Amino acid sequence: MNNEYELINNLDESISELPTDSIVSKTIYKSENQKVILFGFSSGQELSDHTSSSNAVIHIIKGECEIIVGSDTISASSGTWVHMKPELPHSVSALSEMHMLLYLYP
């Protein structure tokens, strides 16, 4: 292990088997100025409308979902990347089993 960087070879392996009707999350990186959280959603699960006090980036790495950002609805799938400024209302609804990274920073 090198103290100058952190490596995860396979993000999917970082999320164990998803129980039915659940959302799991795991903080995979945290520093003074940044936090990265890996989420796993069972199909049909959602994070209801909320805001963040930080800048936030949602990066979908597996599956399909609907992201509502402000008044816009986005059909998202693997590879979708969304940046949001602080205090912008947003929600995420999984249309299939879905994994996403959430980056939070000032």
Where are these regions (language model features)?
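A short, N-terminal "cap"/entry segment at the start of jelly-roll beta-barrel domains
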Residues: 1-33, 68
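A cytosolic small-molecule/anion-sensing beta-strand core signal
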Residues: 32, 61-62, 77-78, 96
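Short acidic-glycine-tyrosine-enriched beta hairpin
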Residues: 71-86
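Conserved short histidine dyad/triad with adjacent acidic residue
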Residues: 22, 32-52
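Glycine- and acidic-residue-biased ligand/ion/polar-headgroup-sensing regions
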Residues: 54-66, 70
